[in-house]
Amino acid sequence: MRRLLLLLPLLFSPTATAQLPQITLTGIYPAGGQRGTSLDVTVTSGTDLDEATELLFSHPGLTATAKLDGNGNPISNRFLVSVDPGIEPGLYDVRLRGLFGISNPRLFVVDTIPEVVETELNNTSGQSQKITLNTTVNGRSDAAADVDTFQFSVESKQTIVIRSTAASLDSLMQPVLELYDGDGRRVAHSRRRQQQDAVIVYTSDDAQTLELKVHDTVYAGGNTYPYRISVDTRPQVDFVQPAIMQAGLQTDVRIFGRNIPGGQPTGLTIDHSPLLSKSVPVILPASDLQSIGTNSAASALDTCIYSGIDGNLVRFAIGPQAAHQPEKSPEEKRSPAQTVTLPASVSGSFAHELDEDVYRFSAKKGEVWLIDVLADRLGSTADPLLLVEQVTKDGEGNESFKRLAREESNRQNPGGNSLPTLTKDPSFQLTVPADGDYQVKLKDRYSVSRGAADMTYSITITKPKRDFRIVLFDSLPSADGKAPPATGAISLRKGGTYQIPVYAYRSGGHNDDIQISSANLPAGIQLSNATIPAGKSSTTVVLTASADAKELASFVQLTASSGAGDQKQDRPVTVATLVHAGANGLPRTGRVSGSLMVGVMKDEQPIHVLPGLQSAEVSQDQQLLVPIKLTRRTGFDDKVDIVFSGQPKNVDVPKVSIAKGQDSVVARFYFKDNVATGPSTLLMYATAQVPYKRNPWQVDRANQVAAQAEEGLKASAQSVVAARAAAESNAAKVVELANMLKTLEQQLVTQQASELATQAELKKAIAGQADANKQLVALQVKLSAAVSEKTPKNVNVDNAIKNLREATLAVNEAARPIADLSAKLKTLTKKIAANKKAVADRTLDITQAKSAVAKQQIRVETAKKAMAAAEAKVKLAEAAKKAAADSVKKAEAAAKPQNKNVRTIAVPIRVVVHLTPGKITVAVPGGGAIKKGASAEVKVTLARKNKFAGAVKLKLQLPNGESRVTSSEAEIAADGTEATLKLTAKADTAAGDIVNAVIRATGDFNGRKASFDAPITLKVTD
């Protein structure tokens, strides 16, 4: 698979551009998963996928949640799917819900073995993706000429089964499988045959690595070409006998296939592999879900796709089971016919070329037997030809054969060109002409060139039962009503309608009305025209959503009923969907869906028309006036055309338009005297070219995002201003702190110098004090000497006294600087201590200042970063603002009004036409002109019809609201043919033409009041 490309939300097909958008789903990937696991699933293709954020499954065991982006918003078209471990393997419906409603269903497969997703590049042998046995690969043919290759290992004598799944995925892929051995030789090959996908069963002689190549049959590819390949050792069931069973009742079923554990040889082969058989007990569940995926040609057949044999989906028909018997063995077929006892059920196959099977039975004159062959409807490739013959014998016992029917007889195709409901399977209701023997011959249409064991069929011969089946075609109406319905689902706009085709299969002589009802329609939704008239095989059901209906997606169950009392029959309504309109060599294809959903979208229906009546009973030769009311929305005010369909032949149908600015009109129908009697459904469509705005809410949301972006930009700009101011403030603070630090450092230098000077001065003072102390000591010595001289030994007393006095003075003088120095020393010591403290304080201040500068520098850097971040945020906000502005422009461009051809259906009118009692002719004088205040006598002549012999009353019938002319009443007696009416124009009325005037005759006929008309021309003149 090459790189996966997600689709843009808006995808349009050529037919869709002319109509209002409605979601359709054409591809999901992968289209299946293993139970008990979760997997990523992507919507790969579809139309009108806007805001698609819901996947809806037909079983509660399958759930999905939208993948989210980084902002927590759902990612369109991407989901996480969880598969409950208790869910049964098989096929399930999945739908997508978005802005434009709910989509058609696509198939999702649940299996039991591990799964992987194909990885590219794997187009050549050297690029083969390696897988293990018992694995399912989800792959896709991505483009033209895409070939996917896979490698896996097998053991000696091991048998493997390679199953492709594409038809069961609603895929356009038609897989071709090619298996190569370890030497590069192709050892097996298979391709899709009709409804059967390719299968390879291979037994390896040696342990080796095998290579599988997968491609489309015409090498096509794209998002609508998914496939699944299972490479495993599980059994391969090719067919079963019987293929018709009763639900809920255990039955021994003989399975035929390959790689069947415990299987017995049959002597036959399929694709060169031995065909084995084995008896197993089977109980078919009664759940409607089990019929999902059945071809629409079998939609009237009760079927079940059984998943009780791992790896296989086996299709059964459900019904009362007649005594079953297999066809004769090849040895037994040497006798001319196989005798069966009625009622009978026989399973057989066209095992070889020119294989013809003959079944003979005895019957009584007047008996009625339904001969029904099942092959195509159960997925077989056989195309049976049916021949019913009466067997007679002459007197000598020689047999002769009279043909009573051939294969084309009794085929029903109510879906016509819309839903493929025509089957190849023949059916014939035999009314036995005489007592005796009869025989049925069966052979394949192409028996001269083909035959195979799996070209199987089942034939039943049973008493016909008066019954019916209803199939609803869940689809999208065409834009113009001319093309057949397209793939779609019931998605209503508020105040709008939706039409759905419904088909009836009748059997056993059933010919009554069939009513369709629902017990669980959501609030605001109404179902109209829910009756298929007696003898009809189809109708159009109309659903209406009220203007105030809520947006929703709801599962709805419909029931069909017919008859009354003990004869009442209730049947579930089968839902069918269109898979392909015809592509890649595949025809227009439909299948059975397991559920019906009704959705109401956010959009409004621009126009809606409503007839003034929903039913009417008329006679041949009668006028019917239908008032029509128009509701305009979304500002639309131009002309609306009204067209009709469904009416029987020989009815004058009006061409009606509702003019600009008007909201009503009256439509005139005239049922001619040769119109067919019986019920019919009158469908009314309003068409107009409407200027349509696609998703205007997207503009509102875009504007809201733009406003938020603008506010975000303002906030970001303010953040920049604040961040810049903070950065500047912090930078200034750094300068201030740096200057302060410089001052502190200068002060520290000064204080340190002062401290040094003081210390030097102190040192000098200390030295001076020491000198003074020495001098004082010397003087004190001298004084002591002088004192000694004062002793008696000293004769020179006066001289001694003098010396003493001088020494004392010297000591005193010497002591004085010592005291001064001591005081100074104390002062210097204090000064030094103060200087040390100042130095320590400045040092601390400097340390703190440096720390403050560092911290402030960090603040500066932080502020710079904040400013840079704010500036970056501004740039992001500017980009967001620009992106939001661009989104607004894109949203406005997308929502710009574009002219769309809107076609909407009204609530249908059920009309019953009865035989007319007669025909009247009217002679109006003056061409119908009557002057104001004057009168005119009108002669009325009656011609009786259909054995009518009663009296009739006559009157002038005017449209509602018209009263300018009045009339007398008259009566034509039972034995009469003429009467006269007097018409009078009011004197004070307006002049002008009177349209849709008739003379109406009314009488009792066939148990009802029957009216019939004669149109007249009337004009009031001055």
Q: Where would I find each of the regions flagged by the language model?
A:
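Short glycine/proline/serine/threonine-rich loop/turn segments at secondary-structure transition edges
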Residues: 86-93, 221-224, 289-302, 449-453, ...
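Extracellular/luminal low-complexity segments enriched in Ser/Thr/Pro
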Residues: 79-87, 284-297, 502-505, 528-532, ...
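Bacterial N-terminal signal peptides
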Residues: 5-14
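Short beta-strand segments of immunoglobulin-like
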Residues: 28-34, 240-246, 476, 487-492, ...
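Extended amphipathic alpha-helical heptad-repeat regions
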Residues: 695-901
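Short proline/glycine- and polar residue-rich coil/turn motifs
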Residues: 69-75, 86, 192-196, 204, ...
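Acidic, Ser/Thr/Pro-rich low-complexity intrinsically disordered segments
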Residues: 19-66, 72-76, 85, 89, ...
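Predominantly extracellular/luminal regions of secreted and cell-surface proteins
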Residues: 106-133, 308-343, 465-470
